[in-house]
Amino acid sequence: MLMPQNPQIYVDADACPVKPEILKVAERHGLEVTFVANSGLRPSRDPMVKNVIVSAGFDAADDWIAERAAENDIVITADVPLAGRCVAKGALVTGPTGRVFDPSNIGMATAMRDLGAHLRETGESKGYNAAFSPRDRSAFLETLDRFCRRVKK
């Protein structure tokens, strides 16, 4: 009989504004973290932290995470298509602002992303994103802590 693996935290690390917060919460809960990026990451001596540099190919980091994420893992990404792939596998998914992606809302999130892309392509929208705020950081910390408690049960 196969033993279930320990829950992992996978981070879509390119341009992720909450890396230090992820490390603190993961350490508090004793969970392993894997940062995945197309470019350099700051090395860590912590054996619970892995850095994976993938090729510069389109969606290479997303593909790496989606292939490995499993039920009861935590995925941190702002990328809606990656979130959808991981939700479909049973992972708990949050964005760096604390936005939760789950089966009840991933369809709408995908539709809104596609609509926004269409509006930008047609010039109807400039596509500005709001600046990352202290409120976003706080919401993220709450969500990640809740997810960590859930996967440890």
UniProtKB/Swiss-Prot annotation:
By its UniProt entry, which Pfam families does this protein fall under? DUF188 (PF02639)
Sequence similarity: Belongs to the UPF0178 family.
Q: What is this protein called?
A: UPF0178 protein Atu1478
Source taxonomy: Bacteria, Pseudomonadati, Pseudomonadota, Alphaproteobacteria, Hyphomicrobiales
